[in-house]
Amino acid sequence: MAGESFEWWRRTMQYQTGLGLTADEKARYEKDYAVYNREKQCKSCYEYRDWMLKYSPTVRFMIQQISKLNGNASDGKVLNFDESKIICDECPDWKSGGFHPEIGILLCQNRLKDKWHLEDTLSHELVHYFDNLKWQIDWLNLKQHACSEIRASALSGECRFSREFARLGFSMNFGRGHQDCAKRRAIISVMGNPNCKDKEHATKVVEEVWDSCFYDTRPFEEIYR
C-alpha cells in the first residue's frame, strides 16, 4: 500500500513538473487520475449522503414526511424510505442533482462542493419527491414544474442568507434575497423543461404561480432554513 502511494505521488509530481514526462505517460496519468478522482468523489458523496440521512434535521424531516405519504405497512407502521433511491453519479452539465419520479434522486458527485452543498441539494430533491407523491406532479406541465421548483429552492436551504451572500456579496437585495434566489433558480430549472420556449417564457410561468407556491411551506410550518 505504501509502495502504491509513493508511486502515485511520484507520478503526480512528474506530471505537475513535466520533468521526464513523455506524451504517453501524460495521457496515462490523466486517464488514471480521472478514474481515481471519480472513485474518490463517489465515495465522498455516499459518505455525505449517509451522514445527512442520520444527522441533518431537514433531510430527516423530509424523509419522515415522504415515508408517511408512501403509505403504511400491513402492521400499521410507516414504511421506511428506500435509501437506494438516492444515488451518486457524475453529471455532464451544471446541475448538482436531479429527481425522476420513477427512479429517485441523483446527487452529482462531480458538482458538489462539500457536505453542506450536498445537504442543500438533497433537501431540494426531497421536496420534489414529496411534491410528486402528494400531488402527482406532471413534470411536463410548466406551472406544476415551476411550483415545485419554487418550493424546493425556498425550503431546501439553498437560498438562505449565508448562501446567497456568499454567491452575490453586497450586490444581493438584503430585503428580498431569499425570494430573488428562489425565483432565479426556479426560472433556470423551468428553462430546462422541453415545453419551455425560452427564459422569457420560464419567467412568465414562474411569476404566474409565485404567490401560491412560495408561501406554501408544506410539510414545514414555515421556511426552516
Swiss-Prot record:
Cleaved signal peptide residues: none
Catalytic center residues: 125
Molecular function (Gene Ontology), one example: metalloendopeptidase activity
Intracellular or extracellular location(s): Mitochondrion inner membrane
Superkingdom of the source species: Eukaryota
Any one Gene Ontology BP term: mitochondrial protein processing
GO cellular component: mitochondrial inner membrane
Residues reported in the UniProt entry to bind a divalent metal cation: 124, 128
Membrane topology listed for this record: Peripheral membrane protein
EC number from the UniProt entry: 3.4.24.-
Pfam families: Peptidase_M76
Entry keywords, A to Z: Hydrolase, Membrane, Metal-binding, Metalloprotease, Mitochondrion, Mitochondrion inner membrane, Protease
Function: Has a dual role in the assembly of mitochondrial ATPase. Acts as a protease that removes N-terminal residues of mitochondrial ATPase CF(0) subunit 6 at the intermembrane space side. Also involved in the correct assembly of the membrane-embedded ATPase CF(0) particle, probably mediating association of subunit 6 with the subunit 9 ring.
Similarity remark: Belongs to the peptidase M76 family.
Record-given protein name: Mitochondrial inner membrane protease ATP23
